[in-house]
A protein has these predicted regions:
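N-terminal secretory/targeting leader peptides
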Residues: 1-94, 112-113, 117-307
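Hinge/lid segment of periplasmic solute-binding proteins
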Residues: 100-113
Length: 307
């Protein structure tokens, strides 16, 4: 009997996530042969859905797997809030190690307890930076009054409001149009999205703020997963481990190639100096401190010191 596995995404072919899904599909079919058939829908937007619809589509079983920003589930799984703390970690490798260790185990348990998913992997959702159409951003004062697109996450909105932005929550599928129309003045995303979504064509000013390391959870419908034969569950885990290693490599590579693309296109790219970055961290500290106080202290320690 062949197990059908449907994997949904919301980005195009060049996306680090879409490319990782292809690695997963090949790895799983190489392991299990005709025992599985993987069907990939790279962009549910082409089916008329918003990106955020993927979460419901997986939870109700229309898809088996998807990737999605952890920030969208933090309201249901409070422990995921540890991944939203800005300026919390400076080392990408250490961040990955924490997610692959005890921190990841805790977060997986939280997701399974509070939702209809299991979190099977933690993908690199990019180091997030600022871009805008108005002016160079060196200080929080430069942010004042700019309409900035955020994810649908109340803490994110509070953080950017503390910097002087006017936050506007917009689905990823609607972001390119919002940028092109001028509905928003600024946004924050990894460089790969800045390029692949065409944002850089309308936002000449890019600030390498590195304010957040994004995490994309690979989520599976829990009931569907638990009903799969053990060999399929084990194969999915093994194939995802291979895909995760590839995905993280893609993310690192895209930072380099996208930065070169911005330089070639003539975008003004500036990197915050250490004092400038400290000024941003100080501006959002009161908001971040409130959020940090809600989290178990040992969870914060697992983020800082991977086990």
């Amino acid at each position: 009997m062949t197990t059908q596995i449907r994997f949904g995404g919301y980005q195009g072919a060049a996306s680090v996530h879409t490319r990782a899904i292809a690695v997963f599909a090949r790895a799983l079919e190489d392991r299990l042969g005709d025992a599985v058939a993987v069907e990939v829908t790279a962009n549910v937007g082409q089916l008329g859905h918003k990106a955020a619809d993927l979460l419901q589509l997986v939870e109700r079983g229309a898809f088996d797997l998807c990737y999605f920003s952890s920030s969208y589930l933090a309201g249901r799984v409070p422990a995921l809030g540890v991944l939203d703390l800005p300026f919390a970690i400076d080392d990408r490798g250490r961040h990955h190690a924490a997610l692959d260790g005890a921190l990841g185990t805790r977060l997986e348990a939280g997701v399974a307890e509070a939702t209809g998913y299991r979190a099977l992997a933690f993908w690199d959702n990019g180091i997030r930076h600022l871009s805008n159409r108005a002016r160079p951003i060196h200080t929080p004062a430069d942010c004042l009054g700019l309409r900035l697109r955020t994810q649908h996450n109340a803490f994110h909105q509070a953080v950017f409001r503390a910097l002087g932005f006017e936050p506007v929550a917009i689905d990823p599928s609607e972001l390119p149009a919002a940028v092109e129309s001028g509905r928003i003045d600024a946004q924050e995303n990894p460089l790969t999205n800045l390029v692949n979504f065409g944002i850089y064509e309308h936002h000449p000013h890019v600030t390498l703020s590195a304010h957040l390391f994004g995490v994309a959870l690979v989520l599976v419908n829990r009931e569907r997963h638990d009903a799969w034969p053990e060999a399929v569950r084990a194969g999915v885990r093994a194939a995802l481990a291979e895909a995760t290693a590839a995905q993280r490599a893609f993310a690192r590579e895209d930072d380099v190639t996208c930065l070169a693309r911005l330089a070639q296109a003539g975008n003004q790219v500036l990197e915050l100096t250490a004092p400038e970055r400290a000024a941003f961290a100080a501006a959002i500290a009161p908001v971040a401190d409130v959020e940090r106080a809600k989290l178990p202290s040992d969870l914060l320690q697992l983020l800082r010191t991977p086990e």
